[in-house]
């Protein structure tokens, strides 16, 4: 297994066998473009954990998307003489815009949290940074935390938000979410599979794993969902089965 420091987003989904992100390649015209499955086959790249997880249904995400679509319908009146097709496309665009804004907000907060653990405090995001720091320290104690490390192992790759090798290790993934103190926050199987794969990929197979939920409704509010070792064993079995499905479906297996 190879592990390297990586600060870019994991959105392009591909890694070299040395653990380096390969999010783009140089096109024939000299311009950088997104890496494709065809490129991955040629370059022997491995898919990211999230790419593999995308092969499974995500009921929670689909329910959220449906809610966004319904909200768009409620707030966008149909114009006089507007065709049904045009109205539907406008509603789709509006609902996707909300999703895009939420994704951008999440990426920005992730970046601020990464900066904090690299020793950089940002006034604009101080509530988020201090909220996470206090919650993580209270839950896990003082650790030698490492940020945004990428890896490749056994046919998959990824990039972890925060982890430590202290003891048997701790692996953390940040999730931004709209919630308040009175709201119940819980993890889903996709979160469990992601963390179980990360701890295997990072060579800390017995690590404690947790999702750290960061409220975008109440900056500074943080809730931690730690998974049991029994859960994580089940998560790894699910991920490993899904990885095999992905490899067969896409006819791409790196040995």
What residue spans do the PLM features occupy?
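Acidic, carboxylate-rich catalytic segments that either coordinate divalent cations
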Residues: 255
């Amino acid at each position: 297994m190879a592990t390297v420091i990586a600060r870019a987003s994991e959105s392009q989904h591909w890694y070299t066998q040395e653990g380096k992100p390969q999010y783009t390649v140089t096109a024939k015209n000299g311009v950088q473009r997104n890496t494709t499955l065809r490129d991955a086959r040629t370059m022997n790249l491995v898919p990211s954990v999230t790419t593999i997880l995308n092969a499974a249904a995500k009921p929670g995400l689909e329910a959220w998307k449906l809610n966004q679509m319904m909200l768009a319908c409620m707030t966008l009146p149909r114009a006089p003489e507007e065709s049904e097709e045009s109205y539907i496309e406008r509603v789709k665009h509006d609902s996707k815009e909300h999703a895009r804004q939420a994704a951008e907000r999440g990426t920005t907060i992730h970046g601020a949290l990464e900066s904090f653990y690299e020793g950089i405090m940002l006034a604009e995001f101080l509530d988020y940074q201090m909220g996470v720091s206090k919650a993580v320290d209270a839950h896990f104690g003082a650790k030698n935390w490492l940020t945004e490390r990428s890896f490749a192992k056994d046919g998959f790759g990824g990039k972890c938000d925060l982890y430590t090798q202290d003891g048997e290790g701790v692996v953390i993934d940040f999730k931004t979410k709209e919630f308040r103190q009175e709201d119940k926050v819980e993890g889903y199987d996709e979160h469990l599979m992601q963390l179980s794969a990360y701890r295997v990929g990072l060579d800390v197979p017995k690590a404690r794993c947790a999702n750290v939920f960061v409220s975008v409704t109440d900056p500074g509010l943080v809730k931690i969902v730690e998974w049991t070792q029994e859960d994580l064993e089940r998560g790894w079995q699910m991920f490993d089965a899904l990885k095999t499905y992905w490899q067969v479906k896409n006819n791409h297996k790196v040995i």
